[in-house]
């Protein structure tokens, strides 16, 4: 039961020390996407990066980017 | 229930919500708010001394050195010593204030590796919270909206315009990260007892962190004018013990 709730979240990122964390969210999301294209969806590393991306980004934002990835209108880099 | 004379001494009711005609602080629940209150009190102490000193000089000058008591005017216009004195003293006072003020400012910005991240999204006119560290069986995140309780639904003892239907539950003695953003216009997420106030700006994510030292219910309000219902989107934080928090999360992701 208690293994369902783990007290773990995205760590403090020394690259982004300020109050403005917009870039943390964006970079964490891209790191997750890069991992996905490299190691595949189900690797432990990618699952961790997915958690960290969702910890730093509003769910709406990630969902919008995922839609854009599908539609081919995503403004960020593409990892093949 | 037995009532002992003087037993009221044991009661200490802490003030975690605004009260009518309040001009002081609410009682602090985080080290940061304790720092803010202490800095304020320290500065006000010296401020009162300075006000008394300046008023005393001003009144002496006005009453003792007017045209009646001194019909012949002095003809000097400089005094190097006194000018040095009244330039250097205020600058030393300002430096004396700057040192603890900057120490506090930088300690507010300090981010310690948090255990929980909560996102607060300001909307017209309610707050949504996302606990995306936790998912249920269907891979859905723990997230909910937090609306004001209308006046007719209030129970005895609840606060008008401050109570919400879904409170944020947070464990005590844990480092918390809050990511604040807006979904439509600028709002501001503020809880006085925790010493936090952070603008919720669309397209930008702002991070604040705090460490609650005692269990309790903390009230705050949207603090950036955001439209007609700006005054009706309060914030309620319930700080509970760690075990209660885990239990709450489990119940929340099970249903
Ligand atoms: Cu607002």
Swiss-Prot record, chain B:
Residues 1-42, 105-255 are mitochondrial intermembrane. This is Cytochrome c oxidase subunit 2. It catalyses: 4 Fe(II)-[cytochrome c] + O2 + 8 H(+)(in) = 4 Fe(III)-[cytochrome c] + 2 H2O + 4 H(+)(out). Component of the cytochrome c oxidase (complex IV, CIV), a multisubunit enzyme composed of a catalytic core of 3 subunits and several supernumerary subunits. The complex exists as a monomer or a dimer and forms supercomplexes (SCs) in the inner mitochondrial membrane with ubiquinol-cytochrome c oxidoreductase (cytochrome b-c1 complex, complex III, CIII). Component of the cytochrome c oxidase, the last enzyme in the mitochondrial electron transport chain which drives oxidative phosphorylation. The respiratory chain contains 3 multisubunit complexes succinate dehydrogenase (complex II, CII), ubiquinol-cytochrome c oxidoreductase (cytochrome b-c1 complex, complex III, CIII) and cytochrome c oxidase (complex IV, CIV), that cooperate to transfer electrons derived from NADH and succinate to molecular oxygen, creating an electrochemical gradient over the inner membrane that drives transmembrane transport and the ATP synthase. It comes from the Eukaryota. The chain crosses the membrane at residues 43-63, 84-104. InterPro entries: CcO_II, CcO_II-like_C, CcO_II_C, Copper_CuA, Cupredoxin, Cyt_c_oxidase_su2, Cyt_c_oxidase_su2_TM_dom, Cyt_c_oxidase_su2_TM_sf. PROSITE patterns: COX2, COX2_CUA, COX2_TM. The keyword Membrane applies. It comes from Cyanidium caldarium. The keyword Membrane applies. Mg(2+) binds at residue 224. Its EC number is 7.1.1.9. Cu cation A1 binds at residues 187, 222, 226, 233. Keywords: Copper, Electron transport, Magnesium, Membrane, Metal-binding, Mitochondrion, Mitochondrion inner membrane, Respiratory chain, Translocase, Transmembrane, Transmembrane helix, Transport. One of its GO terms (biological process) is ATP synthesis coupled electron transport. The gene is COX2. Binds a dinuclear copper A center per subunit. GO terms for molecular function: copper ion binding; cytochrome-c oxidase activity. Belongs to the cytochrome c oxidase subunit 2 family. It is found in: Mitochondrion inner membrane. It is a multi-pass membrane protein. Its main location: mitochondrion. GO terms for cellular component: mitochondrial inner membrane. Cu cation A2 binds at residues 222, 224, 226, 230.
């Amino acid at each position: 039961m208690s293994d369902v709730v783990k007290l773990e979240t995205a760590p403090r990122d020394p690259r982004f020390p300020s109050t403005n964390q917009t870039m943390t969210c964006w970079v964490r999301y891209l790191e997750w996407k890069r991992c996905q294209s490299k190691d595949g969806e189900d690797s432990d590393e990618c699952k961790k990066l997915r958690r960290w991306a969702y910890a730093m980004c509003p769910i709406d934002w990630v969902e919008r980017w995922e839609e854009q990835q599908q539609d081919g209108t995503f403004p960020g880099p593409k990892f093949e | 229930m037995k009532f002992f004379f003087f037993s009221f001494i044991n009661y200490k009711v802490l003030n975690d919500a605004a009260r009518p005609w309040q001009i002081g602080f609410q009682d602090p629940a985080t080290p940061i708010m304790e720092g803010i209150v202490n800095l304020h009190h320290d500065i006000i102490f010296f401020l009162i001394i300075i006000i008394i000193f300046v008023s005393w000089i001003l009144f002496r000058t006005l009453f003792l050195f007017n045209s009646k008591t001194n019909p012949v005017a002095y003809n000097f216009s400089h005094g190097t010593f006194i000018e040095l004195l009244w330039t250097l003293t205020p600058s030393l006072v300002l430096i004396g204030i700057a040192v603890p003020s900057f120490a506090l400012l930088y300690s507010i910005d300090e981010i310690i590796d948090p255990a929980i991240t909560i996102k607060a999204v300001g909307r017209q006119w309610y707050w949504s919270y996302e606990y995306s560290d936790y998912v249920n069986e269907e891979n859905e995140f723990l997230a909910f909206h937090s609306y004001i309780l209308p006046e007719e639904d209030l129970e005895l003892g609840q606060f008008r315009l401050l109570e919400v239907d879904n409170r944020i539950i947070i464990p005590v003695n844990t480092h918390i990260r809050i990511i604040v953003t807006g979904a439509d216009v600028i709002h501001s997420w503020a809880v006085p007892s925790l010493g936090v106030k952070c603008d919720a700006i669309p397209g930008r994510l702002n991070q604040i962190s705090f460490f609650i030292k005692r269990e309790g219910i903390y009230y705050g309000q949207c603090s950036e004018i955001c439209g007609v219902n700006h005054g009706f989107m309060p914030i309620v934080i319930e700080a509970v013990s760690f075990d209660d928090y885990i239990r709450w999360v489990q119940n929340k992701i099970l249903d």
